[in-house]
């Protein structure tokens, strides 16, 4: 009787693993087969979207959020990954949408024009006032923006932001943070970078658990002393990738 029960458990476990693997394969295929803007594809070499999505465990049909979506590079990647049965929230604060004379607002509007990416919902609102129910999102991610919160507004604001993300996630949900690596003694505000040790400290002080960190976007040739928009660095900076999890 015990042997039969153990065999059943092993089979069930194998089925779940297979479903997860096939689900991830479908997600990667969705992205690779998608008709995406040429400008986005040029950035793929440095951003490795399929590798990142696979690392984060995004599944078809998931409800996800691109936090501080800017012009929507990752919004589009996520939209193709989760498929027609999924939902992507593209969040930008009103202040961010006014930046550079409305550049991000115009770029995101163009990206979603004529019903492109029908599974994307714009949230032109602050994280503290999203207007959606709490505990309803499977995964949220923010890419190359977290440094702006910490460098401009400080530790308390960064922790408050993380708490806002925590609130919108389902139990067991994932929060991914990608950013340009800075140094402890560098002018990270001017360089648009984030000291990795500081990020780890913020994670430790937040409600999240550190689930994993990835080396997919690391570049040892970047010594962290140059601005991220410098021609020889732009699109190819050394970047950390953290996968945080809200406890179940």
Give a label for each model feature.
Residues 79-80, 156-171:
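A short glycine-rich, Lys/Arg-flanked "PGG" loop and its adjoining helix->strand segment in the class I
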Residues 130-141:
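A short acidic, Gly/Pro-enriched loop at the edge of an enzyme's catalytic core
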Residues 100-130:
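S-adenosyl-L-methionine
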Residues 27-55:
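Class I SAM-dependent methyltransferase Rossmann-like catalytic core
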Residues 112, 187-213:
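Conserved Class I S-adenosyl-L-methionine
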Residues 61-70:
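Conserved class I S-adenosyl-L-methionine
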Residues 206, 221-248:
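Core SAM-dependent methyltransferase catalytic element
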Residues 172-180:
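Conserved beta-strand signature within the Rossmann-like core of class I S-adenosyl-L-methionine
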């Amino acid at each position: 009787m015990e042997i039969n029960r153990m065999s059943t458990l092993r089979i069930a476990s194998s089925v779940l693993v297979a479903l997860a693997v096939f689900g991830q394969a479908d997600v990667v295929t969705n992205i690779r087969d998608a008709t995406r803007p040429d400008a986005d594809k040029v950035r793929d070499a440095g951003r490795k979207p399929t590798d990142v999505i696979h690392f984060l465990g995004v599944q078809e049909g998931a409800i996800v959020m691109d936090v501080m979506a800017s012009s929507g590079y990752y919004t589009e990647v996520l939209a193709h990954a989760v498929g027609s049965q999924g939902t992507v929230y593209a969040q930008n604060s009103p202040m961010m949408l006014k930046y550079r004379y409305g550049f991000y607002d115009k770029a995101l509007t163009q990206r979603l024009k004529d019903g492109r990416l029908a599974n994307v919902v714009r949230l032109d609102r602050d994280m503290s006032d999203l207007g959606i129910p709490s505990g309803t999102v499977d995964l949220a991610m923010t890419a190359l923006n977290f440094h702006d919160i910490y460098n401009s507004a400080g530790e308390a604001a960064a922790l408050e932001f993380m708490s806002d993300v925590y609130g919108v996630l389902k139990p067991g949900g994932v929060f991914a943070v990608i950013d340009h690596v800075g140094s402890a003694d560098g002018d990270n505000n001017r360089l648009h970078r984030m000291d990795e040790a500081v990020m780890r400290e913020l994670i430790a002080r937040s409600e999240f658990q550190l689930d994993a960190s990835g080396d997919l976007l690391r570049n040892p040739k970047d010594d962290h002393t140059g601005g991220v928009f410098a021609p020889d660095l732009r699109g190819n900076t050394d970047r950390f990738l953290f996968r945080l999890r809200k406890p179940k």
